[in-house]
Amino acid sequence: MVLNKVTYKINAYKIKEEFIPKEVHFYRIKSFVNEAFNFYRFVNFYGGMIINKKDKSFVLPYKVDNKVLKYKDGNNEIPIDIEYIKSLKLEYVKPEIAEKLVRGYLKSVHKIEPELSRIIKNIRKHKVVENIKVESYCEYEVKKHDGDYYLILNFRHTASITKHLWDFVNRDKALLEEYVGKKIIFKPNPKVRYTISLVDAPNPQKIEEIMSHIIKYYKWSEDMVKSTFGEIDYNQPIMYCEEILEPFAPQFCNLVFYMDELDSYILKELQSYWRLSNENKGKIINEIAKKLRFIDNTPKELEFMKFNNTPLLVKDVNKNPTKIYSTNTLFTWIYNQNAKIYLPYDVPEIIRNKNLLTYILIDEEIKDELKAIKDKVNKMFRNYNKIANKTELPKFNYANRWKYFSTDDIRGIIKEIKSEFNDEICFALIIGKEKYKDNDYYEILKKQLFDLKIISQNILWENWRKDDKGYMTNNLLIQIMGKLGIKYFILDSKTPYDYIMGLDTGLGIFGNHRVGGCTVVYDSEGKIRRIQPIETPAPGERLHLPYVIEYLENKANIDMENKNILFLRDGFIQNSERNDLKEISKELNSNIEVISIRKNNKYKVFTSDYRIGSVFGNDGIFLPHKTPFGSNPVKLSTWLRFNCGNEEGLKINESIMQLLYDLTKMNYSALYGEGRYLRIPAPIHYADKFVKALGKNWKIDEELLKHGFLYFI
């Protein structure tokens, strides 16, 4: 495979030698600690890493002269006796451990975080719209690349109420208690969100300690504290949060929220502040870097591979395979009689040549538009059904099934449909008036319809009525096809894997057991084979990959023997899983590979280009798509192979990145032109969507999932 190469700058800056430790030092906790002692939190506070949980050994990026370290446990400061084990030159430490120790060195010894906080506040002023404030905060990590250590530097945004929390609740403790369970930020460090768990009695001494911490650690002056928070109220209650033991004072905190909770006008105004092109974001990051003393201020230039725009396969009217390079013209024949007709590559047997009972559900607030709505629906379904009659596609039988519904009376329309329902797979097209505040404006209606085995798709009339060129109609049809399990296209060439599986974990209810996650199984053609919920052995238990493999083979009857299998997952392989995976690969005589794909990461590429990928250190930087306001790359952090009882770490390369790019095209829920495919490969994208649907209490229909129906999208 030959890929073109391009060069772009990324947000990586070489760390100066004087800010990198020469040696690291190993210690062990000597004294007894109680069961409440949080070993991870203790080591992380001092910028180190755990080596062995059992014998309480850890490593620090600096030498400790005093053999007693302090551990804060609520109100108490506990002395922890430690003993020295050995020292080791940093160059002899594994890169993934060394990176974290260099980060800990910058954090604990050189106090990089308060310095970044001061710099970003000077460079990027906050924005206020009505009572909502958006401000920027920095984040960072350390990566080793070609023998040098680099600081990966980025900034994000957080939105909060302008008033501090104590004023927001009108200095009323009872009202503050109503916000237990809500998210807050600690004003001097807005990048971390905390969840209020307890509102306690006032404690002036703790208020003084919090103030002292702000002044000493974050380098705020007393005048800055007063100008930001006003006169300090020493009689305010103390709060505790789920994430850490330290107390909080509401006067130093702000209530935060999610973007979908905002009024649309406020959201639009704030988006103009935080939606930046990659080039503009790069300029701001460079400004921050120039003021940071730990690094060279020139960003790293990196060579990227430009992925090939490989074709997809559909079928022509003679059912012969034909190539396409984008999917946005698949249904042009609905509106243009001269357009080429494309047929799907695979139709599930359970709906093949079926007449689907179809309901047209119209929001009663747009009943005056009935004539125009009927024209749109008739044109789409009549033209579609003409073609479907000559193929294996299902037909939509919607005659005399036009109904009005009210969003205030979902029960009424469900009751009406239920009275004439025949217990077969049906379809409903929901035509709505407007987008309501909840994420999916007709989610309740769609879920209740699906309880009756009616798969549905919604569209806003306000948008559809303006669709003169048929783009929205085309998109609507592919969404309907995907929900009905129709695989309209496949990859042009087979992959080297028998199965490519996307794995995501989460919470949901399945039967009488807790569902721990979902695996979406694609075959070698890039086609969805099935969607499989995974039950956990016990409620709340984390899913381990070896258990998932056994579950797929034993409970889901997927043949895993003598196969070449690729797992894509959003998360790391735990050490405890590795030995089991080696054993399973030996028992099954199968090659099992796992790639960790991280959507949330700190990398930024200073370009609007897309369809590109590179390797930095041991990370893959993967940027398959574009957006109008700056695309975030995906990080490929680990690629492991388990074969015949052996484990091998693989290096991210051109071939695997090209395959992952090809899989971003396998989007059965939207039509896009080149460059507007999925951000992550389809198997893990749909696994994530299914887990989110479980969290919203969508019903699980195993029969439909076996055929790859995306009814939950």
From Swiss-Prot:
It holds the Pfam family Piwi. Changing Q574A: Loss of guide-dependent cleavage of tDNA when gDNA starts with 5'-dT but not 5'-dG. The gene is ago. It comes from Methanocaldococcus jannaschii (strain ATCC 43067 / DSM 2661 / JAL-1 / JCM 10045 / NBRC 100440). It is an enzyme of class 3 (hydrolase). Also liganded by DNA. Cleavage probaby requires 2 divalent metal cations. Residues 426-699 form the Piwi domain. Its cofactor is a divalent metal cation. This is Protein argonaute.
